[in-house]
């Protein structure tokens, strides 16, 4: 089991994991977040959300100043104390949001793929799609290194679309509710490994890592963790890990923040 006194990093997905997928409630996890904060354990948020959205969430969760992984790993917000880093305050993996927009525009124009991106609609429509208020919806549109969209074509056409993207050095990632196009070099796992190495240098010791996630797109992140909590989710595909050893992986009975708390209780119950 883990100890709160270990050199430790916690990486967590948001929607469906730390946050309830429908209500965005996080309060069941509050006692653990407080304990981790008081013990100086970094809790690193990982999501398809934009950095602007996640910085606001960090403040709500009392995690401000810590690193975060946004846009499925295409953006890393650096620790507030790393201002000497040449890319401070954010690292961007691969090509920019505007460059990806241009690629998608050309593909849609040339091959008539059917999809609707967040850039195609206004804040009101985003609010209807997500259940967020208008101010929060505006933050979801502030992508820096990815494009979020709703796919409106057939599975066969999707396979063709993915092949075109791959040829252009891009990938198509399915999140909790939307699809995301980002550079093929980006990923939650690559971003997590970068941060683990940064903390190893800072602490002069390799951190132990615990990751929490609920969907198939969290598997790459959980695969690079020392320990993992698979929070019970709504996705029928489930979460398939390369190493599903029960000494390393706990699968919760509860969903969302209740499952998050359950997983933390499990790994730290003997600390």
Curated annotation (Swiss-Prot):
For the ligand (Mg(2+)), the binding residues are 13, 15, 214
Compartments (UniProt record): Cytoplasm
Record's Pfam families? Answer: Hydrolase_3 (PF08282)
> Which SUPFAM superfamilies does its entry note?
HAD-like
Q: Which GO terms describe its molecular function?
A: magnesium ion binding; mannosyl-3-phosphoglycerate phosphatase activity; phosphatase activity
- The EC number of this protein is 3.1.3.70
Q: Which cofactor does it need?
A: Mg(2+)
Q: Among the record's GO biological process terms, what is one?
A: mannosylglycerate biosynthetic process
Which superkingdom heads the taxonomic lineage of this protein's source?
Bacteria
Taken from the UniProt entry, a GO cellular component term is: cytosol
InterPro entries referenced in this protein's UniProt entry, alphabetically: HAD-like_sf, HAD-SF-IIB-MPGP, HAD-SF_hydro_IIB, HAD_sf, MPG_Pase
> Which keywords does the record carry?
Cytoplasm, Hydrolase, Magnesium, Metal-binding
Q: Where is the active site?
A: 13
- Give the catalysed reaction(s), semicolon-separated: 2-O-(alpha-D-mannosyl)-3-phosphoglycerate + H2O = (2R)-2-O-(alpha-D-mannosyl)-glycerate + phosphate
Metal-binding recorded as keyword? yes
The UniProt entry, under CDD domains, shows: HAD_Pase (cd07507)
Q: Which family does it belong to?
A: Belongs to the HAD-like hydrolase superfamily. MPGP family.
Database matches in NCBIfam families: HAD-SF-IIB (TIGR01484), HAD-SF-IIB-MPGP (TIGR01486), MPGP_rel (TIGR02463), PRK03669.1 (NF002976)
| PANTHER family named in the record | HAD SUPERFAMILY HYDROLASE-LIKE, TYPE 3 (PTHR10000:SF8), PHOSPHOSERINE PHOSPHATASE (PTHR10000)
Listed name of the protein? Mannosyl-3-phosphoglycerate phosphatase
| Species this chain originates from | Salmonella typhimurium (strain LT2 / SGSC1412 / ATCC 700720)
